[in-house]
Amino acid sequence: MLEQARNTLQMEADAILELVPRVDEHFSAAVAMILDCPGRVVITGMGKSGIIGRKMAATFASTGTPSFYLHPAEGIHGDLGMVTESDVVIALSNSGETGEVLHILPSLRRIGAKLIAMVGNAESSLAKNSDITLDVGVSQEACPLGLAPTSSTTAAL
């Protein structure tokens, strides 16, 4: 049991280290976009990405950056009215193909909000339709059962 716990932690650490070379000009551009945002930082994502999004929004708010989480399914049904052209939207999707997230993209474009994608697939539809893409993909999840998105959610944080 201890060995399995150590292996899991090592896999998580390795996944984070995979990101180091990807802290590049895209990362700098995303930070600049957020710092220059005259509105709020809106985070969206489904499932586990949504849980990470809620945590990110809370962290932004704690550090003085106006932020909130927008559930994309609720966005489809009217909550996009909370988003303005002054906002930056960060959309999280490991696959970059999450239907609910992709469904709100045309409306976000019409509103005029800027869009940062955090994806595990830099060639995905979400990545291709964003202003800035951050590739946070991992080569392996740390879940010993192969069921839970462990390393990918840690990388997104």
Q: Positions of the model-derived regions?
A:
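An N-terminal, well-structured beta->alpha segment
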Residues: 1-36
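Glycine-rich phosphate-binding loops that contact phosphosugars or nucleotide phosphates
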Residues: 39-46, 50-157
